[in-house]
């Protein structure tokens, strides 16, 4: 991870060399004020994300203890679900059989 070299204080205290045709000091100061504001926001955001990351890591380490109970409950379908599925399949097969008799039975007669 990259190290942050600047702090809002370092940016504020930065001195620039002046020359005959140097930069406008007020313009540089205004820009640095904006940089300091943004930098302060970034620091707060990083702290917030680090706290959230720590909470999620703590939650992830405690989650495996509760996960096996959930996994075993969902890994085996219940007998009621299996019975309903087979009853539905049986009904579908009966309907298909009746439809085939209707369609193909009439064709044989004609």
Curated annotation (Swiss-Prot):
Keyword Membrane among record annotations: no
Keyword Nucleotidyltransferase: no
Keywords linked to the UniProt accession: Cell cycle, Cell division, Cell shape, Coiled coil, Cytoplasm
Quaternary structure, from the entry: Forms polymers through the coiled coil domains. Interacts with PBP1, MreC and EzrA.
Protein name: Cell cycle protein GpsB
Positions of disulphide bridges: none
Organism: Streptococcus thermophilus (strain ATCC BAA-250 / LMG 18311)
Compartments, record wording: Cytoplasm
Biological process according to GO: cell division; regulation of cell shape
Family of the protein in this entry: Belongs to the GpsB family.
Annotated coiled-coil segments of the chain: 37-63
Pfam families noted in UniProt: DivIVA
Main localization (coarse): cytoplasm
InterPro entries registered for this protein in UniProt: Cell_cycle_GpsB (IPR011229), DivIVA_domain (IPR019933), DivIVA_fam (IPR007793)
Cellular component aspect of the GO annotation: cytoplasm
Gene symbol of the encoding locus: gpsB
HAMAP family recorded: GpsB
Main function: Divisome component that associates with the complex late in its assembly, after the Z-ring is formed, and is dependent on DivIC and PBP2B for its recruitment to the divisome. Together with EzrA, is a key component of the system that regulates PBP1 localization during cell cycle progression. Its main role could be the removal of PBP1 from the cell pole after pole maturation is completed. Also contributes to the recruitment of PBP1 to the division complex. Not essential for septum formation.
Region (Disordered): 59-79
Ranges of Low complexity composition bias in the record: 60-75
């Amino acid at each position: 991870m990259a190290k942050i070299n600047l702090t809002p204080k370092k940016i504020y205290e930065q001195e620039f060399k002046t020359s005959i045709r140097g930069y406008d000091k007020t313009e540089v100061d205004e820009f640095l004020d904006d940089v300091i504001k943004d930098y302060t926001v970034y620091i707060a955001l990083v702290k917030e994300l680090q706290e959230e990351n720590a909470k999620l890591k703590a939650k992830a380490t405690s989650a495996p203890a509760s996960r096996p109970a959930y996994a075993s409950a969902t890994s085996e379908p219940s007998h009621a679900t299996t019975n309903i599925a087979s009853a539905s399949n049986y009904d579908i097969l009966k309907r298909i059989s009746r439809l085939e008799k209707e369609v193909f039975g009439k064709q044989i007669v004609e």
